[in-house]
Design a protein with these regions (language model features):
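Short glycine-rich anion-binding loops that position phosphate/pyrophosphate groups of nucleotides
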Residues: 33-35, 99-102, 125-127
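Short, glycine-/small-residue-rich phosphate/pyrophosphate-handling segment
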Residues: 129-171
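Short acidic/histidine-rich motifs immediately flanking catalytic phosphotransfer sites
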Residues: 87-94
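Extreme N-terminal starter segment of soluble prokaryotic enzymes
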Residues: 24-27
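Short beta->alpha junction loops
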Residues: 70-78
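Glycine- and acidic-residue-enriched helix-capping/strand-helix junction motifs
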Residues: 38-52
C-alpha cells in the first residue's frame, strides 16, 4: 500500500494493527507576493529557478518523506491568511516565504502566531545581507525558525525540518487497556 501511495502521490489511509487510523502528515507551503516571478525577477539575487520548479522539487521531496504537501502562491496578504485559516485544523506544519510582506505583514504575522502547528520562514536570499530596510523581518518572531540565503535549497531544507517538527508534535495514539 505504501508503494501505491507513492505512485499515486496521495495519502492512503489504513487502519493500523490496533485499529487506529494512520493519516499522512499534511504540510502547507505559502509563497508571498511576486514569487510567481522567480526565474525572471532579479536572477542575480534569486537565481533562475522558477516557482514551478521549486514546487516540483518540494513535491518530489514530500513523496520521499511520505508527507502530503500543498503549495500556494498569492500576491495578496489576505489570501495567504485565508489559506492558513482554512487549514488550521488539517495541517501539521507550514513553510512561509512572506516575500514583500516580510517587513510589513502585520496581519500575516498575527495569523501565523494563531496557528497550532509549527511554521518556518524561508527566503531564497539572505535578507540580512541586502538593503538595510530588508534586514528586519516582522514575521520572524511569529515562527519557529528561519532559513535564508540558500536559494531554492532554503525551501527543501525547510520542508525536511518542518516534516520532522510536525512528526514530533503529532499526538500518539492512546493505548487501550483490555
Amino acid at each position: 500500500m505504501e508503494r501505491l501511495s507513492k505512485l499515486l502521490g496521495c495519502a492512503i489511509l489504513a487502519a493500523g494493527p490496533e485499529g487506529h487510523d494512520h493519516a499522512m502528515t499534511r504540510l502547507l507551503v505559502l509563497h508571498g507576493p511576486n514569487l510567481n516571478l522567480f526565474g525572471r525577477r532579479e536572477p542575480h539575487i534569486y537565481g533562475t529557478t522558477t516557482l514551478a520548479q521549486i514546487d516540483e522539487k518540494l513535491h518530489a521531496l514530500a513523496r520521499e518523506l511520505e508527507v502530503s504537501l500543498e503549495c500556494f502562491q498569492s500576491n495578496h496578504e489576505g489570501a495567504l491568511i485565508d489559506k492558513l485559516h482554512a487549514n488550521i485544523d488539517t495541517v501539521q506544519g507550514a513553510l512561509v516565504n512572506p516575500a514583500g510582506l516580510t517587513q510589513h505583514g502585520v496581519a500575516l504575522h498575527d495569523a501565523i502566531k494563531a496557528m497550532p502547528f509549527p511554521v518556518l520562514e524561508v527566503h531564497m536570499s539572505n535578507i540580512a545581507a541586502r538593503e538595510p530596510w530588508r534586514a528586519h523581518s516582522i514575521i520572524s518572531p511569529a515562527v519557529r525558525g528561519t532559513l535564508q540565503g540558500l536559494g531554492w535549497r532554503s525551501y527543501t531544507a525547510g520542508l525536511r525540518i518542518i516534516a520532522e517538527l510536525a512528526a514530533e508534535s503529532r499526538p500518539t495514539p492512546k493505548e487501550t487497556t483490555p
